[in-house]
Amino acid sequence: MKKFVIALLLIPYLGIAQTLENLDYISPFNDGVAAIKKGNEWGFIDQEGKLIVDFRNDLVVTKTDNANYPIFEDDRCLIAHHKDGVLYYGYINKEGETVIAPQFLNATNFNNKKAIALKVHKETIGYNDIFKKDVVSYHYFEVVIDKTGTTIDHLTQLALHVSPQNIKNSGSPTITSKFISANLVAVKGNNSKWQIKKID
């Protein structure tokens, strides 16, 4: 009987949401969630204060007017992973699951269910008999992707050549195109002039 009474007294306390303490930063809510920082890791809470994405170190921060923190847009948040010394970008959902594997040299946050990314293409251009290896060329295009990571449209038709060694030394290439409305993208050409492209 004593155990039963103790159990009844504990029930109200078990229903209380977890308390998150010793946080270094709490962002404003965006897309129904807020980023929280503890040490060098970020996580996300929902509007009830429940931790929905556990603390992790691969979330990409976005520069805002007031601070830098990871954000969700259209149920997607940028992540970055190193592969062979090169940083590749992908996306997670609000359950913390990787929904677009890190594969892009750079990427933007989603906006109206679309994002701009630098997609890498690897082309075998020959074979080196001395080293017994394929000779490969890497180039990338600016592309618009949907929420599954599928390419909707190529923004740059001319491939920009890059070697993984150069990326290791200089960091992620810059995305020059930008959304100016839900279906219009401003694309910067090689002559530093802009063109407007409609994305369906």
Residue positions per predicted region:
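Bacterial Sec-dependent N-terminal signal peptides
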Residues: 1-20
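Residue-level detector of conserved, function-critical positions
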Residues: 18-200
